[in-house]
Amino acid sequence: MRGSLQAYKKVSVDSQLSAASPHKIVQMLMAGAIERLIQGKAAMQQGNIPVKGERLGKALDIIISLRSCLSMEDGGDIAKNLDQLYDFMVNQITQANHKNDPQMLDDVIEIIREIKSAWDQIPPEYHNLTAAEVGI
């Protein structure tokens, strides 16, 4: 039963991705990072080291992917600030994992929630535009 549910979730995510705008994909990645961080924190608190490592590793992968998508040439100060925040988050997650410190994960969760909240406020008419089209 569990395998069937996982397969269904994967098909659902795959179908959402295939029809998603770049804006929506970033929203999904941020939501996925938050979810993995919460799961990793719970595993940390329960002493479940394998699950903690797997979930925090996935959160790191997502954050590193988001960071790699930044356009430093087009994004100006916003891209530079996000780059610094993503770097901070990667370091915090790594240290939280090493020190087994859930509070450090709470800090990262709060930061990414704030970034996602700002991202969610972007009006729909801008969801498919490139930096050149916006005039950045």
UniProtKB/Swiss-Prot annotation:
The keyword Metal-binding does not apply. It comes from the Bacteria. CDD domains: FliS. One of its GO terms (cellular component) is cytosol. Keywords: Bacterial flagellum biogenesis, Chaperone, Cytoplasm. It is found in: Cytoplasm, Cytosol. The keyword Plastid does not apply. Its main location: cytoplasm. GO terms for biological process: bacterial-type flagellum assembly; bacterial-type flagellum-dependent cell motility. InterPro entries: FliS, FliS_sf. PANTHER family: FLAGELLAR SECRETION CHAPERONE FLIS. NCBIfam families: fliS. Belongs to the FliS family. This is Flagellar secretion chaperone FliS. The gene is fliS.
